[in-house]
Amino acid sequence: MQKILNDPEPFVDEMLDGILAAHPDQLQRPSPRAIVRADAPVDGKVGIATGGGSGHLPVFMGYVGRGLIDGAAIGNVFASPSSDDMLDVTRAINGGKGVLYLYGNYGGDRLNFDLAAELAADEGIEVRTILGADDVASAPPDRASTRRGIAGIFFLYKVAGAAAAAGASLDEVVAVTQRAAAGTRTMGVALSPCTIPAAGRPTFELPIGQMEIGMGIHGEPGVRRGPLETADQIADELTSTILADLPYGRGDEVGVLVNGLGATPKEELYILYRAVAGILDGEGLRVHRVWVGEYATSLEMAGASLTLIRLDDELRSLLDAPAETPFFVQA
């Protein structure tokens, strides 16, 4: 294991120390594993809270800021934060209009955050929950509610955060974010594993020259493993799988996210998008906006994911709204 670290045990806390030291004007830390906006709570605004295990920057805390989310509970690498962490975030961002919990569909997170929501309710804070469940490889359509949440949660953060910043009520933020979630799908490919610092060994084995389609961001098994294919072939499989899962009509408008998993250069991501763009054009779909880069990673895993979101006028406007965090800026 070759990593820039001290003792693996305080890896997450030292990372948080560094982020807060670099961005004290944008972030504050009400408790050791809670990160919120520097100006939180924002009075009269719906608070947006998220959380999950470390190792996925900029997910989760990287989207804490203006026009996105208000706070994040931080767990150990690939491990759920505690209910106390999420309750600390909830208290710190409560501006009096309620709080939306928006996070990926994983068992540990659901258990701990449901408890946090109950404890917040006991304190008079209304909490609603939406789960990101965009990974089409993780379950068939008839079990879509059990799917994992991966890079598509970026679009949900963007929609919910923009709606809340515009003054929407909790019911309105929930409604538009649910609509965004219903039209968001992701499919990924892994080319190499990552290593959790405390474990000191790769999370899975994938020989050189092999790829795994549909692997999860924690190393969960995908749908197939085989020889590494060309960028065009990978793009075709990812795109066709997404379009088959949620059929789009000719003339529909979409947003596109090509996401690197941590060790894949942007050059390769753009080669992938080159092929995706041609496929979408051939299907008669109009691309409104494209995001290419690292939006939801898995430490140093090599690979990429493709996310499509089906747009309407309101979703388009919310995706285009300005946002600013230490990890993401959109004018």
Segments and roles (model prediction):
Residues 1-48, 313-331:
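N-terminal amphipathic/basic leader segments beginning at the initiator methionine
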Residues 2, 46-53, 69-72, 98-107, ...:
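Short glycine-rich or small-residue beta-strand-to-loop segments that form or flank ligand, phosphate
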Residues 56, 65, 69-96, 243:
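Glycine-rich oxoanion-binding loops at beta->alpha junctions
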Residues 72-77, 121-146, 282-287:
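Short, acidic/small-residue loops that bind anionic groups at enzyme active sites
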Residues 110-124, 143, 268-274:
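Short Gly/Thr/Asp-enriched flexible loops that form oxyanion-binding sites at enzyme active sites
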Residues 131-172, 176-183:
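Short alpha-helices
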Residues 166-271:
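Mixed-charge interfacial surface used for oligomerization/domain docking
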Residues 241-331:
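C-terminal non-catalytic interaction/assembly regions of soluble proteins
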